[in-house]
Amino acid sequence: MPSRLRKTRKLRGHVSHGHGRIGKHRKHPGGRGNAGGMHHHRINFDKYHPGYFGKVGMRHYHLKRNQSFCPTVNLDKLWTLVSEQTRVNAAKNKTGAAPIIDVVRSGYYKVLGKGKLPKQPVIVKAKFFSRRAEEKIKGVGGACVLVA
């Protein structure tokens, strides 16, 4: 049905808008929003929203969450953490300043030694290095920097 034929369009300009005398079509008879969930709307809340009110169980205040959280990245994925432009620049001038790869900024803590590194020096910053990773990074003329 086109909106020009709808009842609301017909009632524009009429104060009561089809609800009788002022005050007859009352404001918010049941309260606004979720009002009365524990009182006059309780039946509806119990039937359609069980468990909406109340608490369950106990809260562990000083819970130690995953003390051994240590996301890892392998050497073969190391160069994917820097931009394409950095990779191209590093490949072009191997004698210039070595690019710095900060794995902590990418969400990793530890560098593991799987895979091969391209034969160009690189400075890697991480919280932990495996022995193999450290050997391989230093083998291509790079450096391992420990960060807190």
Curated annotation (Swiss-Prot):
<feature type="modified residue" description="N6-acetyllysine">
    <location>
        <position position="55"/>
    </location>
</feature>
<feature type="modified residue" description="Phosphoserine">
    <location>
        <position position="68"/>
    </location>
</feature>
<dbReference type="InterPro" id="IPR030878">
    <property type="entry name" value="Ribosomal_uL15"/>
</dbReference>
<feature type="compositionally biased region" description="Basic residues">
    <location>
        <begin position="1"/>
        <end position="30"/>
    </location>
</feature>
<dbReference type="GO" id="GO:0003735">
    <property type="term" value="F:structural constituent of ribosome"/>
</dbReference>
<keyword id="KW-0963">Cytoplasm</keyword>
<keyword id="KW-0379">Hydroxylation</keyword>
<keyword id="KW-0597">Phosphoprotein</keyword>
<comment type="function">
    <text>Component of the large ribosomal subunit. The ribosome is a large ribonucleoprotein complex responsible for the synthesis of proteins in the cell.</text>
</comment>
<feature type="modified residue" description="N6-acetyllysine">
    <location>
        <position position="47"/>
    </location>
</feature>
<comment type="similarity">
    <text>Belongs to the universal ribosomal protein uL15 family.</text>
</comment>
<dbReference type="Pfam" id="PF00828">
    <property type="entry name" value="Ribosomal_L27A"/>
</dbReference>
<feature type="region of interest" description="Disordered">
    <location>
        <begin position="1"/>
        <end position="37"/>
    </location>
</feature>
<dbReference type="InterPro" id="IPR001196">
    <property type="entry name" value="Ribosomal_uL15_CS"/>
</dbReference>
<keyword id="KW-0689">Ribosomal protein</keyword>
<feature type="modified residue" description="(3S)-3-hydroxyhistidine">
    <location>
        <position position="39"/>
    </location>
</feature>
<comment type="subunit">
    <text>Component of the large ribosomal subunit.</text>
</comment>
<feature type="modified residue" description="N6-acetyllysine">
    <location>
        <position position="110"/>
    </location>
</feature>
<keyword id="KW-0007">Acetylation</keyword>
<dbReference type="InterPro" id="IPR027386">
    <property type="entry name" value="Rbsml_uL15_N"/>
</dbReference>
<dbReference type="InterPro" id="IPR036227">
    <property type="entry name" value="Ribosomal_uL15/eL18_sf"/>
</dbReference>
<dbReference type="GO" id="GO:0006412">
    <property type="term" value="P:translation"/>
</dbReference>
<keyword id="KW-0687">Ribonucleoprotein</keyword>
<dbReference type="GO" id="GO:0022625">
    <property type="term" value="C:cytosolic large ribosomal subunit"/>
</dbReference>
<protein>
    <recommendedName>
        <fullName>Large ribosomal subunit protein uL15</fullName>
    </recommendedName>
</protein>
<dbReference type="InterPro" id="IPR021131">
    <property type="entry name" value="Ribosomal_uL15/eL18"/>
</dbReference>
